[in-house]
Amino acid sequence: MKYGICSLSVIPMRANPAHESELVSELLFNDIYTIVDENEEWLKIKGCYDAYEGWIRKLQHQSISHDEYQGYISREKYIINKAFSLYDNKILSFGSKIFEKTSDSILLRNNFDRLSFTESALKLKDVPYRWGGKSVMGIDCSAYVQLCAKVAGYKLPRDASQQAEHGTEIPSLTSAYPGDIAFFENNNKRITHVGILLSEDKIIHASGKVRIDKIDSTGIYNEELKGYTHHLAYIKRL
C-alpha cells in the first residue's frame, strides 16, 4: 500500500479524475491518506481521518513511507483553532494539524468539549459556502460541523447523513442545549443539511455562507428571504 500527506495548505478532492469533476472534499495541511487507485495524472485516495475518498492530482501528492504514516497517526498533534493562521510560510485553515504548539493552535483532544464546539462554530461566521469545501475559502454544511467537532474533540464523519447516525436524539428544541446538532431533510426524508444550535431558537450553519438564523419546530427561517429554507428532521446530542 502507498501513503501520502498533504504538504500544501489545501488540496481539492474530486469525484472523478478530471479538473472539471465535482469537488467532493478537501485535504488540509498534514492530513494523511492511503492511495487506492491511480492513472497517469491522478491518484484516488482515502483520508485517514474520515475514510473519505476522492481523486487528487499527482503533482500535489507528497509520498510518505508506511513507518512515517504510522508515526503521524501516533504523534501528538495540535490543531489550528483560528479561522486561519500563518505557519511555515503557508496560510493554514481552521482544523489543520501541526506538530507543535503555537498561539493559534490547541492540543488535539479526544474528549468532547461542548463549549469549544459552539465557540469554534462562531469563529467561522461569514465564511462562504462552497460545495465540497473544507476551508475558510469555502466550506459546506457537513464539513463545517465536522471541523468544529474535530477542534472540540469529537470525530464525526464527512457527510450529514453519516453524522446523523451519531449521538442521542433530543425530543424537541425546548429540550436542546447549545452545541446540539440539528439535521434537516428533503421531501424524500433524506438528510441533506446540518447545523449547530446556539440556543433553542438560533442555529449557525453553512448556507450561502456560515450564518446565524432562527429555528423552530418547522425548520430554519431566513429573515432575509422571509421564509423557511430547511425542514427540521431531528436533533442529536454528542
Language-model regions, residue ranges each:
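Structural motif
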Residues: D31, S96, G179-D180
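...with weaker cross-activation on analogous glycine-rich loops/strands in unrelated enzymes
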Residues: Y154-T218
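Short, basic/aromatic beta-hairpin or loop at an interaction surface
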Residues: M1-R14, E68-K82, L147-Q163
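SH3/SH3-like (including bacterial SH3b) beta-barrel domains
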Residues: N16-F29, L86-L92, S172
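Boundary regions of SH3-family modules and the immediately adjacent low-complexity/disordered segments
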Residues: M1-K2, S25, G47-V127
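Short aromatic-glycine-enriched beta-strand elements
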Residues: E40-K44
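Aromatic- and glycine-rich peptidoglycan recognition patches
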Residues: V10-I11, S63, I170, L198-L238
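Active-site nucleophilic cysteine motif
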Residues: A121, V136-A152, P157
